[in-house]
């Protein structure tokens, strides 16, 4: 059985990742593909607990500790969900993955990118997406969108300067790996974004 395709959706707060992930899942299933959908942090019992902690506005976490919590969740997700699904030949869709740590804890919090990459390589065993869709959005607009969802979480409460660094971090990652990244303007109509994402997935044999 051939290895499945690993697709991640990335972007700043309020970019519409969850919406496009659901649309892509529906298209893949309609085309007859077996699909596993998950998210970071989350996707496992440990990941769910980590998510509760890192997004809780009442919890203060220093930057390296924050990264290590995400890494613990990621290690569990790779072992329990991602690798088994890919080995079954399934298409895996993940709402955020390692690039989010490089953007948020690296560019955003100022941690050493070489250190983060080294730890991430160990945590993931080198598991890299075949396609990463980056929904790019001005942070001010993204935070406005996110605020409409309700009480902001710990990351959404960070200042605009932090979120601008995160956005630039994502764009720098995409510039460094243009073969893996598809960068889309998240202010475009949802139907247009869905069509471009589907075209990129189809180019990769799906």
Swiss-Prot record:
Record-linked PANTHER family: THYMIDYLATE KINASE (PTHR10344), UMP-CMP KINASE 2, MITOCHONDRIAL (PTHR10344:SF4)
Protein name: Thymidylate kinase
Family: Belongs to the thymidylate kinase family.
Protein origin, superkingdom: Bacteria
GO cellular component: cytoplasm; cytosol
Sorted UniProt keywords: ATP-binding, Kinase, Nucleotide biosynthesis, Nucleotide-binding, Transferase
EC number per UniProt: 2.7.4.9
Gene Ontology terms, MF aspect: ATP binding; dTMP kinase activity
Catalytic activity: dTMP + ATP = dTDP + ADP
Gene3D superfamilies given in the database record: P-loop containing nucleotide triphosphate hydrolases (3.40.50.300)
Cleaved signal peptide residues: none
UniProt lineage: Bacteria, Thermotogati, Deinococcota, Deinococci, Deinococcales
Family matches, as PROSITE patterns: THYMIDYLATE_KINASE
A biological process term (GO) from this entry: dTTP biosynthetic process
Protein purpose: Phosphorylation of dTMP to form dTDP in both de novo and salvage pathways of dTTP synthesis.
Family annotation (InterPro entries): P-loop_NTPase, Thymidylate_kin-like_dom, Thymidylate_kin_CS, Thymidylate_kinase
Residue positions binding ATP: 11-18
């Amino acid at each position: 059985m051939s290895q499945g395709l690993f697709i991640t959706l990335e972007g700043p707060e309020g970019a519409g990742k969850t919406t496009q992930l659901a649309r892509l899942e529906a298209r893949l299933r309609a085309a007859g593909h077996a699909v596993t959908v998950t998210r970071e942090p989350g996707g496992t019992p440990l990941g769910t607990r980590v998510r509760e902690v890192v997004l809780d506005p009442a919890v203060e976490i220093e930057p390296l500790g924050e990264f290590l919590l995400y890494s613990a969740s990621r290690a569990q997700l790779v072992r329990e969900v991602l690798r088994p699904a890919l080995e079954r030949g399934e298409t895996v869709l993940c709402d955020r993955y390692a690039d989010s740590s490089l953007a948020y804890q690296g560019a955003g919090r100022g941690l050493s990118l070489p250190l983060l990459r080294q730890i991430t390589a160990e945590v993931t065993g080198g598991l890299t997406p075949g396609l990463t869709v980056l929904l790019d959005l001005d942070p001010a607009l993204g935070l406005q969108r996110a605020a409409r969802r309700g009480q902001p979480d710990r990351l959404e409460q960070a200042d605009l300067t932090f979120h601008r660094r995160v956005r630039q971090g994502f764009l720098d990652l995409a510039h460094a790996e243009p073969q893996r990244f598809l960068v889309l303007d998240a202010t475009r109509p949802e139907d247009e974004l869905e069509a471009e994402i589907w075209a990129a997935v189809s180019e990769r044999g799906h």
